[in-house]
């Protein structure tokens, strides 16, 4: 395979970033920074995990070529949020609403048994239909009302009589509630800033296509695997540039 090309950040004035990482079977993590508006990768990194140091370094590299990071849409990973707040505190953060819905529906299952879980599942499934600030306010009011109604049930605890150890009786309901409450401050940024994407679905789709190609080349050594990914990203990026000319 020819020597891998050197990645260069293409300068532009302002970007609405999608940031996400995906893991492969060989424990390699690919971090991608995508420009939502032109559907192109600005920067990538092959690493072992979504490390705070790497994320901060990459965001600085993007800023250092004169690009203003207007917003970041991500799945809510703690290190991504922290890196954005430390390197570009002026950037708008948007939590991927599809990811929130997916996680909560997975934890609550398709057919929850309790009234509280059924109502929360219905609420969270409505997120995809919210397009305005007014609709977001109504949704949050409904969530607060739901939480007030079921607060005692959500926080109910079970205790081991012997050890005294306790746990939340309705663990997945409590986890889902906490997940939503942590996300709310950055859940509806897109309703106030209309160029901010509300999901990172396009980057997930990109990962899916990459993994489809990799399945056709099973058995690559780690070095050849990384070279394949680098070439794929480079060629996809240049194909995108050509189509926009």
Regions found by a protein language model. Give the residues of each.
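Charged, low-complexity, helix-prone segments enriched in Lys/Glu/Asp/Gln
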Residues: 1-8, 104, 108-119, 146, ...
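A generic structural micro-environment signature
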Residues: 25, 52-53, 94, 104-110, ...
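A short hydrophobic/aromatic micro-motif that marks alpha-helical segments and, especially, helix-coil
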Residues: 35, 50, 114, 217-219
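Short, charged/polar low-complexity linear motifs in solvent-exposed/disordered segments
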Residues: 36, 43, 59-61, 111, ...
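Acidic/histidine-rich catalytic cores and adjacent linkers
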Residues: 71-81, 88, 121-245
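Conserved beta-strand -> loop -> alpha-helix junction used to position metal-binding or nucleic-acid-contacting
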Residues: 72-78, 83-124
